[in-house]
Every structure is written in structure tokens, then in C-alpha cells.
């Protein structure tokens, strides 16, 4: 797994902690499962696309629960 992907995973877990307690477990597991799925990605363009989707989805979830 590339360093960029590991860093993105850490950032997502930090954001998960900002969610209401009942939903934290679900989104932490969701993030873990998706990052494991993409752990073999090596192509820089694919990694950029993945990180952009992660950012977009994370922002959407945070707006949804506020």
C-alpha cells in the first residue's frame, strides 16, 4: 500500500471520530474494507482518483450528519 493511501486512511479515521458515536463503527469499518480493497493500487493516476473519491465521500458524510 502506498504512503499516500495510508495517509488518506489515517485522515479518514480522524474524520470518522468527528461523527456521532452511533455511526462511527459503521463508517470506520466501511473505510477499512474499502482501503483493503484498494491496497494493491500502484498507478499514480488511480491513486489520485481514489483519494479524490475518498475526500468527496468523506465531506458528503460529514455534511449529512451535521
Curated annotation (Swiss-Prot):
Pfam families found in the cross-reference section: Complex1_LYR
CDD domains per the UniProt record, alphabetical: Complex1_LYR_LYRM9
Membership in a protein family: Belongs to the complex I LYR family. LYRM9 subfamily.
Protein name as catalogued: LYR motif-containing protein PHYPADRAFT_186863
Organism name: Physcomitrium patens
Amino acid at each position: 500500500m502506498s504512503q499516500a493511501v495510508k495517509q488518506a486512511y489515517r485522515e479518514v479515521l480522524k474524520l470518522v471520530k468527528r461523527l456521532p458515536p452511533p455511526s462511527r463503527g459503521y463508517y470506520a469499518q466501511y473505510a477499512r474494507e474499502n482501503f483493503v480493497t484498494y491496497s494493491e493500487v500502484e498507478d499514480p493516476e488511480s491513486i489520485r482518483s481514489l483519494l479524490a473519491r475518498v475526500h468527496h465521500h468523506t465531506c458528503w458524510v460529514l455534511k449529512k450528519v451535521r
